[in-house]
Amino acid sequence: MKLNDVTRGTGLEEHGIINANLIYWTPPTAVLYEQIVERGEGLVSHLGALAVKTGHYTGRAANEKFIVDEPTSRDHINWGKVNRPFDPEKFDSLYKRMTAYMHGKDLFIQDCFAGASPKHRLPIRVIAEKAWHSLFARNMFVKATAAELENHKPRFTVIDMPNFHAVPQIDGTNSETFIIINFAKRLVIIGGTSYAGEIKKSIFTVLNYLLPHHSKVMSMHCSANTGEKGDVAVFFGLSGTGKTTLSAAPNRSLIGDDEHGWDDDGVFNFEGGCYAKIINLSKESEPEIYETTRKFGTILENVAIDTISRRIDLNDDSFTENTRASYPITHIPNIVPSGMGGHPTNVIMLTCDAFGVLPPIARLTPEQAMYHFLSGYTAKVAGTEAGITEPQATFSTCFGAPFMALHPSVYAELLKAKIARHKVNCWLVNTGWSGGAYGVGSRMKIGYSRALVNAALDGTLAAGQFEKDSVFGLDIPRACPGVPGEVLNPRNVWADKAAYDATAKDLVEMFRKNFEQFKANVSQEVACVL
């Protein structure tokens, strides 16, 4: 179909969808704005961003995600708490009810691509009942040109119906909400949730299955940027570790902020947009992202808005702390328009260690890099409402466990091979606490973290001297421009050295306990890192 075509009930027969009312084919942003306002789905805020509410779900419904247990993918999926099996017959029955639900409804289609690389991009189609979800898909995925739309044949389709609910007793779901991926039918169905992030992350899960399994392309939950000389850096990290902040640097161009592939040519963005957390966002700390909240085309999820003045309050968490902005990457200055870069020179693994015992930066051997990649460690501090003040260790393998469909060892082996082949420098960066655990020490200054990352990327650290950390076996630099020397070794800034030793030992034990699950699939050298 052409850009902004409208048909009455025709064009979706291949998906089993007949008798829909108006079908809007890849409508542009301005048309979607008109539809969103007309249908009461959102408000246009001061300076043009669109404010919407997601209702009951203000984040991913992790317990409602399934993968259909069918012969083509059954033996490759890493089944467990994350990848739950779903009965094929139940899927077919649920899907038939969904298609019946769409009778007489207006639908919004976005035909686009997942992946910036022409070699590996996946043609996709997003069919949505909400106009703002169609705008979200338009923002987040790679847009097709007018010529490409003429012959667009989706290889995966997302059908997103927030107002359609499952019946758990009949459908075999856990609740009325569901996100189900069917690799045999190349289909994702979503119902019972208006949280748009489910669209993005379901396609990420699809790519995390297809690319490593079929094309030996490393799929990564990471940000990436490139320097003036073309040197690429990849930043792995869980939420809250500084992935977006540290990859946004004035002297480097952004390739992408969240999802990437690494093939024989280099790194490429999976997306055409960004989905940034914006709670307490300020113009001073994050000027580029702040400006996107004032731009036409940006979607502001669950952000407080004055309905009279239409001004937004980014500090208001009345609806959720997980307020988000979805915007095309072109809203950000200093980007790589192609979404592609060369092979990484540096890989940085970010952690926010609330125990305060990991160094602010350390050089990793290839074996240590594998260990920390498989561990995916960070630490969180629970909210005061729960009465918990002690840090809690979190391990999310490959820095993105909820989205990894294959066994973690598949991704680890791909990363190991690429690090070796391209002689990549690997670093562990702790953006968490220093001088003591949470409640005693203080958060690492962002200025120090930026200086350390810059020194790693420009070669300053590699050219200097290192000392061996006695607890974690890490190489710690002896000096870094712009960072006090005593900060570099975490033990030095703890007033109570015995407390440091005990806390560090406890964290080592947490690492070891978590890593037991991987020992059978790694070399002895990796298994014995800690």
UniProtKB/Swiss-Prot annotation:
GO terms for molecular function: ATP binding; metal ion binding; phosphoenolpyruvate carboxykinase (ATP) activity. Mn(2+) binds at K201, H221, D258. Pathway: Carbohydrate biosynthesis; gluconeogenesis. InterPro entries: PEP_carboxykinase_ATP, PEP_carboxykinase_C, PEP_carboxykinase_N, PEPCK_ATP_CS. Its cofactor is Mn(2+). ATP binds at K201, H221, G237, L238, S239, G240, T241, G242, K243, T244, T245, E286, R324, S449. Its main location: cytoplasm. Pfam families: PEPCK_ATP. CDD domains: PEPCK_ATP. GO terms for cellular component: cytosol. Transmembrane segments: none annotated. Involved in the gluconeogenesis. Catalyzes the conversion of oxaloacetate (OAA) to phosphoenolpyruvate (PEP) through direct phosphoryl transfer between the nucleoside triphosphate and OAA. PANTHER family: PHOSPHOENOLPYRUVATE CARBOXYKINASE (ATP) (PTHR30031:SF0), PHOSPHOENOLPYRUVATE CARBOXYKINASE ATP (PTHR30031). This is Phosphoenolpyruvate carboxykinase (ATP). It comes from Geotalea uraniireducens (strain Rf4). The lineage of its organism: Bacteria, Pseudomonadati, Thermodesulfobacteriota, Desulfuromonadia, Geobacterales.
